[in-house]
C-alpha cells in the first residue's frame, strides 16, 4: 500500500504533513509514537477518510481493531462462536481460534466477565474473520497482562506467516511489540512517518524525543 504526500488534519490541527505512507504485505508494519501525536486518528482515517486521501479500494478492504471496536459482551464465548459460524467459514473460525488458543477460555462465562486479554482474543477472532486484506491494529496490547501480550505476539507472528497476502499495520507505543514481532518499523514523529531499518535506532529516537 502506497500513498504519497499524505496529509492528515483533525479539528484544524495538522498531524501529518506531506509524508509518504508505504506498508508492505506479508509482514507486520509497526508504527510507534508518543501519546497524543495522532496515531489513533491515523488508524481511523483508513476507514473514515478524513484526509480525503484514502481510496475506496482501501476503505472497503480494512478491518480496524482498537479499544473502540466492540463485540457483544452479554453473551458467552460459545454463543459468539455459534453466531459467527452462521456468517463465516467453519474452517477459518477453527484455524484462528486454534492460533489464539481460545480453548482456554470458559465457553459458558459471559464475555463481560472475562479478563481484558480474553476479550481481546475474541475481538481479534471476530474482526479477522472478515478476511479483509488490510488489518489495522490500534494499541491492541495496551493494558493487557504480560502473559496475554506474549500470546498475542505469538499469534500475530503465526498469522502473518500463514496469510502473506495481508497488510498488517500495528499502531502502538509498546516497544516490546518491536522486539517480539519482526517486520518493518516506522515512527510517527514531527508530522511524518519515518522508517527505520534498525529497531534499536528507532527505540533510541523514540526514547529521546
From Swiss-Prot:
Binding sites annotated in the UniProt record for ATP: 33-40
One GO MF term: ATP binding
Keywords: ATP-binding, Nucleotide-binding, Transport
InterPro entries assigned: AAA+_ATPase, ABC_transporter-like_ATP-bd, P-loop_NTPase
Highest rank taxon of the organism: Bacteria
GO cellular component: ATP-binding cassette (ABC) transporter complex
Coiled-coil regions listed in the entry: none
Free-text disruption phenotype from the record: Up-regulates expression of the LiaRS two-component regulatory system; this effect is more pronounced on modified competence medium than on rich or sporulation medium.
Pfam assignment, any one: ABC_tran
Domain ABC transporter: 1-207
The keyword Nucleotide-binding appears for this protein: yes
Role, per record: Suggested to be part of an ABC transporter complex YydIJ involved in export of the modified peptide YydF. Responsible for energy coupling to the transport system.
Protein family membership: Belongs to the ABC transporter superfamily.
Protein name, UniProt field: Probable peptide export ATP-binding protein YydI
Amino acid at each position: 500500500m502506497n500513498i504519497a504526500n499524505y496529509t492528515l488534519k483533525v479539528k484544524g490541527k495538522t498531524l501529518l504533513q506531506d509524508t509518504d505512507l508505504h506498508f508492505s504485505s506479508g509482514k507486520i508494519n509497526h508504527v510507534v509514537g508518543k501519546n497524543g501525536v495522532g496515531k489513533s486518528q491515523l488508524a481511523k482515517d483508513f476507514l473514515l477518510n478524513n484526509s480525503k486521501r484514502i481510496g475506496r479500494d482501501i476503505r472497503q478492504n480494512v478491518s480496524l481493531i482498537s479499544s473502540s471496536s466492540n463485540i457483544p459482551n452479554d453473551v458467552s464465548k460459545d454463543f459468539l462462536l455459534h453466531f459467527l459460524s452462521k456468517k463465516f467459514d467453519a474452517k477459518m473460525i477453527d484455524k484462528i481460534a486454534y492460533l489464539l488458543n481460545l480453548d482456554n477460555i470458559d465457553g459458558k462465562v459471559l464475555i463481560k466477565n472475562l479478563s481484558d486479554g480474553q476479550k481481546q482474543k475474541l475481538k481479534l477472532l471476530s474482526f479477522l474473520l472478515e478476511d479483509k486484506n488490510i488489518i489495522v491494529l490500534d494499541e491492541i496490547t495496551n493494558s493487557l497482562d504480560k502473559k496475554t501480550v506474549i500470546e498475542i505476539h505469538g499469534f500475530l507472528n503465526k498469522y502473518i506467516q500463514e496469510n502473506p497476502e495481508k497488510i498488517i499495520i500495528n499502531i502502538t507505543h509498546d516497544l516490546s511489540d518491536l522486539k517480539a514481532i519482526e517486520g518493518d518499523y516506522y515512527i510517527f514523529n514531527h508530522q511524518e512517518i519515518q522508517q527505520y531499518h534498525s529497531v534499536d535506532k528507532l527505540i533510541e529516537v523514540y526514547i529521546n524525543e
